[in-house]
Amino acid sequence: MRVVVSRVFSLGVTGVEGYLVTVEVDIGPGLPCFEIVGLPGRAVREARDRVRAAVSNSGFTFPVRRIVANLAPGDIPKAGALYDLPLAVGILAADGQIPEGPLERWVFLGELSLDGGLRPGRGVLPMCLSLPALGLGTVVLPADSACEAAAVPGLEVGGMSCLADVCRAVEAGRLPHGGRRGTRQAGPMEGADGVGARPTGTLHGDLAEVE
């Protein structure tokens, strides 16, 4: 059986500074399991159950094989549930259920509910502020977090409602209607988690409305 490895970009935050996280997913032979390595915190380890349910309830097949996901760099602790979405996308790409094309230029963030819906999380703004320096210009995240991400000038923001919508965008190779384009810098009254942010990006259209 051929071993397949996918790579999906995500973000982490240390203090108020964001950094790039590469989510590598290996699917191979062996006893069925789903392991996450790379200093995952408790919420990250619990992603195994959320991702498994979300994938199955979104109309996809969760692979009954040995799955190992690595969150690189491996020497920095990873916290929070925002790695749910990149983990799910990485598994589906490694299993050949969605194409890998857009994965090399998009960044994914978002907590998954058991039915495949996307939930917002904290720390989106400082994470996304790091993207221009990293040379990445597109982020896919929960629709309720799109306003925060739109505070980053020039950033293409895809606010999505569920995993199925994300996968449709990946299959199409583009965000619906060009996504939302960031047009301003974060204001001085906004905290590290974007509290106080107001949407100023021009909305060209999301794939689906917020649930």
Q: Which residues does each PLM region occupy?
A:
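Peripheral, non-AAA+ core regions of ATP-driven protein-machinery
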Residues: 1-211
